[in-house]
Each structure stands twice: as structure tokens, then as C-alpha cells.
């Protein structure tokens, strides 16, 4: 049950931040948070993370739905809380972006914008962060905890 609440919290955090951006920053505008490093930039992405598969909405929506169902299955199949938390984070992020893909025809709202010297990292959002951090936690689980669970 706690994992359903966590997933809902991850989705809510993502959607709330996107709502704040859409209501307060004009599309394409950039607000400096830390000069030459971190900006809030209202952008839309019609593809997947980091701009791959542009205009791939009709592929990304059904793939996300199928993968989300699989993730729910694995959350309830495994009893390890670390594993379940990792998958909950991934699912919360996936559902946050799925909501945008279904209800925003102009793309997923992105706004976290980082620059490192001459390198400009692709603009992303809180949902993307949840997916990446959840995936890193899942990798950690697979490499270091899974073996202990099997003993």
C-alpha cells in the first residue's frame, strides 16, 4: 500500500512542478537560477528523454502503458522494500510523463536546464529525474542487494 502512495506522490510532485512552470514561465523563456550553470527553461519535448524519438507519441504512449503494467506486477511480486521503492520511483516518473503525452498534444513539459562550460545538457523534468534515479537504485539493488536476498 505504501508504494501506491509513493507512486502517487512522485506523479504529484512531477505534475505540480510542471503546472508551476506552465503558469509562470512563457514557453521558451529562460530564468537564471545559478548563472552559467542552472536555469529554469520552459520547453516541450515531443519525444523521449533527451529528445530521442521526436514526435514518437503514438509509440511512446502504448510502450509506457505496457511497461507500467509490468512494473506494477514486479512491485507486488517482490517483497524487498529497496527494490519496490526503486520501481515505484521509475513508475512515478513514467506516469508523470505519460500524463503529459496523453493530455498535452504539444509535448512533455521540460524545464530543468543545466550547462557545464560549453556543454548544454538537454532540458528535462522531475519525472525524468525519478526515472533515472530509480533506475540507478535498481542497478544498485541488482548488483549488491539481490545476491543477499537469495541467501
Swiss-Prot record:
Subcellular location: Cell membrane
Residue ranges of the TM segments: 56-76, 82-104, 126-146
Membrane topology: Multi-pass membrane protein
MF (Gene Ontology): aspartic-type endopeptidase activity
Catalytic residues as annotated in Swiss-Prot or TrEMBL: 110, 128
Record's keyword terms, sorted: Aspartyl protease, Cell membrane, Hydrolase, Membrane, Protease, Transmembrane, Transmembrane helix
Signal sequence extent: none
Keyword Transit peptide belongs to the record: no
Enzyme class: hydrolase
GO CC annotation: plasma membrane
Any Gene Ontology biological process: proteolysis
Superkingdom of source: Bacteria
Annotated catalysed reactions: Release of signal peptides from bacterial membrane prolipoproteins. Hydrolyzes -Xaa-Yaa-Zaa-|-(S,diacylglyceryl)Cys-, in which Xaa is hydrophobic (preferably Leu), and Yaa (Ala or Ser) and Zaa (Gly or Ala) have small, neutral side chains
Pathway given in the UniProt record: Protein modification; lipoprotein biosynthesis (signal peptide cleavage)
Enzyme Commission number(s) from the entry: 3.4.23.36
Main subcellular location of this protein, as a coarse class: membrane
Family: Belongs to the peptidase A8 family.
Function: This protein specifically catalyzes the removal of signal peptides from prolipoproteins.
Protein name: Lipoprotein signal peptidase
Upper lineage: Bacteria, Bacillati, Bacillota, Clostridia, Eubacteriales
Gene name linked to the record: lspA
Amino acid at each position: 500500500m505504501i508504494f501506491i502512495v509513493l507512486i502517487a506522490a512522485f506523479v504529484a510532485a512531477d505534475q505540480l512542478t510542471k503546472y508551476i512552470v506552465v503558469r509562470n514561465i512563457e514557453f521558451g523563456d529562460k530564468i537564471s537560477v545559478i548563472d552559467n550553470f542552472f536555469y529554469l527553461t520552459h520547453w516541450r519535448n515531443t519525444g523521449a528523454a533527451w529528445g530521442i524519438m521526436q514526435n514518437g507519441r503514438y509509440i511512446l504512449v502504448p510502450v509506457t502503458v505496457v511497461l507500467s503494467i509490468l512494473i506494477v506486477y514486479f512491485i507486488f511480486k517482490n517483497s524487498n522494500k529497496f527494490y519496490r521503492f526503486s520501481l515505484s520511483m521509475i513508475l512515478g516518473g513514467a506516469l508523470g510523463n505519460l500524463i503529459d503525452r496523453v493530455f498535452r498534444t504539444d509535448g512533455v513539459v521540460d524545464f530543468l536546464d543545466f550547462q557545464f562550460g560549453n556543454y548544454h545538457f538537454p532540458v528535462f523534468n522531475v519525472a525524468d529525474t525519478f526515472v533515472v534515479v530509480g533506475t540507478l537504485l535498481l542497478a544498485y539493488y541488482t548488483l549488491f542487494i539481490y545476491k543477499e536476498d537469495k541467501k
